[in-house]
């Protein structure tokens, strides 16, 4: 498929007229010559939003089977892009080919997961409370509930996952599954990859006969184009993965609208790892090497990167640090996604190293180019950590901080001082269970996913996954951005009272022609 640098607005390919952008190859440290990508003008934003608004009712009225087939068609079209997609993503991100192949599998897998969710119909949460005309002292009306899509959704592609959290990523897949048209703001770090995937979606739209306005792809600076999209009255929700600053800027814009809308922003997390005494004594070396592998995976560019380690002071922790430092020293520097991310990592690492009481205990191989970064491991005492809020700030990249605590009570105090997190990990053995049980209440308050004897950098796409957490991990701790229940972000309930049966949505009619799971008087039918 030939790249053109055009945006996709409904069924049309449009050359942006408000400026130009070029893709960048971080491995070579130079721009990619062709194509040049045109930036959206305000008229392009208006057109995409109007098309999405006009497509909403027609799209959500599609049979569930047709909606599911559309999602599967998107997956098929992405696979059909073949090596061209992987090659372009590799050029734009520096990510290894094997990693990108795996990410493509994850991307099409979650599209097919949501197709299954749509076909099953359980997401509609259909519930029926039949009329009770003879009830005293007052009769009860016939009441039936079903969820419907919110309306057009704006999705911001993430820098660190050019496929799985981008144009056809989890936000787009779950919004389309909910019956919502999607407008994607392409991330500037992978413009060509975004165009390829956008064209795959557009091909699926045409093949399945969906309304043209169900999908658009715009290009431009996030602050300008993003602000215009979130402000537009047709837009009813936002999906975002990125920095705390960027996410909160969108939240403020959304809240300032005459009609505020939800922004589901995944932002900042340092993902604490607690090393319990028995586990540290029995297998500290293995934990240390596994931790370093997780820390440096993808040059640390995961929102679930283990950026904080808590442990009780003693010889076993000394050995853990020694082994971790030795393992880190063998790790080569890697190419980060963009020059800006690499610069921010160096800046954040420098600030962390200058905080009171910090000691560097290990480092990976030094960077050889401006877009490369090496790992770093630091140590600080719990009292110093508690005295300085800046220790809780995320350093996006392969850097982590070990906090030495006097006892479990001090571990608990450090955990209490943390902001909300995506994950918290417990490295423990059977003898550690009483200590782990004492920390569970605070861990449950702080994080969306709790792990035992694993590492947080893997996020499975499945029904039970939670990729979310209290602020600032996300802007809304009640939902997840990964897994089947991510669809809940883009739905709202509607109650139908005393409706004629043939005027009800099919899922609420007495004969249940969709054969979806339902509750009747609070019990499964």
From Swiss-Prot:
EC number(s) from the headed UniProt entry: 1.2.1.26
Metabolic or biological pathway: Carbohydrate acid metabolism; D-glucarate degradation; Carbohydrate acid metabolism; galactarate degradation
Catalytic reaction equation(s): 2,5-dioxopentanoate + NADP(+) + H2O = 2-oxoglutarate + NADPH + 2 H(+); 2,5-dioxopentanoate + NAD(+) + H2O = 2-oxoglutarate + NADH + 2 H(+)
Signal sequence interval, chain numbering: none
Classification via Gene3D superfamilies: Aldehyde Dehydrogenase, Chain A, domain 1 (3.40.605.10), Aldehyde Dehydrogenase, Chain A, domain 2 (3.40.309.10)
Positions bound to NAD(+): 185, 188, 242-247, 394
Catalytic residues of the enzyme: 266 (proton acceptor), 303 (nucleophile)
GO BP annotations listed: D-glucarate catabolic process; galactarate catabolic process
GO molecular function: 2,5-dioxovalerate dehydrogenase (NADP+) activity
Disulfide bonds: none
Enzyme class: oxidoreductase
Pfam families per record: Aldedh
Upregulation: Induced by D-glucarate and D-galactarate.
Record keywords, A-Z: NAD, NADP, Oxidoreductase
Assembly with partners or alone: Homodimer.
Free-text function comment from the UniProt entry: Catalyzes the NAD(P)(+)-dependent oxidation of alpha-ketoglutaric semialdehyde (alphaKGSA) to alpha-ketoglutarate. Involved in D-glucarate/D-galactarate metabolism. Prefers NAD(+) to NADP(+) as a cosubstrate.
Similarity annotation: Belongs to the aldehyde dehydrogenase family.
Protein name: Alpha-ketoglutaric semialdehyde dehydrogenase 2
Organism: Azospirillum brasilense
């Amino acid at each position: 498929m030939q790249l053109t640098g055009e945006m996709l607005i409904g069924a049309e390919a449009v050359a942006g007229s408000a400026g130009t952008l070029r893709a960048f190859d971080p491995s070579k440290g130079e721009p990619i010559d062709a194509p040049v990508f045109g930036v959206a003008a305000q008229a392009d934003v208006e057109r995409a939003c109007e098309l999405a608004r006009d497509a909403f009712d027609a799209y959500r009225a599609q049979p569930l089977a047709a909606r599911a087939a559309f999602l599967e068609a998107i997956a098929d079209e992405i696979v059909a892009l073949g090596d061209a997609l992987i090659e372009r993503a590799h050029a734009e991100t520096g990510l290894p080919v094997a990693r990108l192949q795996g990410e493509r599998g994850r991307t099409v897998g979650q599209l097919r997961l949501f197709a299954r969710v749509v076909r099953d119909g359980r997401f509609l949460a259909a519930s029926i409370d039949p009329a009770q005309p003879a009830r005293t002292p007052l009769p009860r009306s016939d009441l039936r509930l079903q969820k419907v899509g919110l309306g057009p959704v704006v999705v911001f592609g993430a820098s660190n996952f050019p496929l799985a959290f981008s144009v056809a990523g989890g936000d787009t897949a779950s919004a389309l599954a909910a019956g919502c048209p999607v407008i994607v703001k392409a991330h500037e770090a992978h413009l060509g990859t975004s165009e390829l995937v956008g064209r795959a979606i557009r091909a699926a739209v045409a093949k399945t006969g969906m309304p043209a306005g169900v999908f658009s792809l715009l290009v431009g600076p996030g602050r300008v184009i993003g602000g215009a999209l979130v402000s537009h009255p047709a837009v009813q929700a936002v999906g975002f993965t990125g920095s705390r600053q960027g996410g909160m800027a969108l939240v403020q814009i959304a809240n300032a609208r005459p009609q505020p809308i939800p922004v589901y922003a995944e932002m900042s997390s340092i993902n604490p790892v607690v090393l319990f005494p028995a586990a540290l004594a029995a297998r500290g070396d293995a934990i240390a090497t596994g931790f370093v592998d997780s820390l440096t995976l993808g040059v640390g560019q995961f929102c679930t990167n283990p950026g904080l380690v808590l442990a009780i002071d003693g010889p076993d922790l000394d050995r853990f640090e020694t082994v971790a430092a030795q393992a880190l020293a063998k790790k080569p520097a890697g190419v980060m996604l963009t020059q800006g991310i690499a610069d921010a990592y160096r800046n954040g690492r420098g600030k962390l190293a200058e905080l009171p009481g910090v000691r560097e205990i290990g480092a990976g191989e030094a960077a050889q180019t401006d877009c490369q970064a090496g790992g770093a491991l630091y140590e600080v005492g719990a009292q110093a950590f508690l005295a300085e809020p800046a220790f809780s700030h995320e350093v996006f990249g392969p850097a982590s901080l070990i906090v030495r605590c006097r006892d479990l009570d001090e571990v608990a105090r450090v955990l209490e001082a943390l902001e909300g997190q995506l994950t918290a990990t417990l490295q423990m053995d059977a003898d550690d269970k009483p200590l782990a049980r004492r920390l569970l209440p605070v861990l449950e308050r702080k994080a969306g996913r709790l792990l035992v004897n694993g590492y947080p950098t893997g996020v499975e796409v499945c029904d039970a996954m939670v990729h979310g957490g209290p602020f600032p991990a996300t802007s809304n701790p009640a939902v997840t951005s990964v897994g089947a229940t991510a669809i809940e972000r883009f739905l709202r309930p509607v109650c139908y009272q005393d409706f004629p049966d043939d005027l009800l949505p099919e899922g609420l009619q007495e004969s249940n022609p969709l054969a979806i799971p339902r509750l009747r008087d609070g019990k499964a039918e």
